[in-house]
């Protein structure tokens, strides 16, 4: 990740950063500067940290992030000049210059390995479709959480099944107008 991240930060017009990318950025001041410079270049960026990743980026503890989730998300958004999705119960979406949003959907079933990757992919797809970072993040977080809220009680939520169900549910909306 650390070998390719400088080039990705410089060249990608739209970017979602999660997991290892966030940990590498947290430990590298040069990458932090490159991340900040993306906004000035008009490059859309969304960070999707969980509380521990957010803590590393802010130089705090995860307990401090959890205690002040709104503040932490806004600070990250302002620090890196991008949209931040602080995952967890009451996922927070923060964008510089905008009021932070608290997502009303989702539940503990999303605390499953790989579901954050599904969310990152959903945000990336919306960015690729032309939505701005704040719109892409808030819509994706809502849909991701709504899928978990509607999940059948007798069925296990896995990342693979979540991705397939979201894909099937969203396919009609992605079809070109007039397509059958």
Language model features: what each stretch is:
Residues 146-180:
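Charged C-terminal helix
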Residues 56, 93-95, 119, 145-152:
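Short active-site-adjacent structural elements
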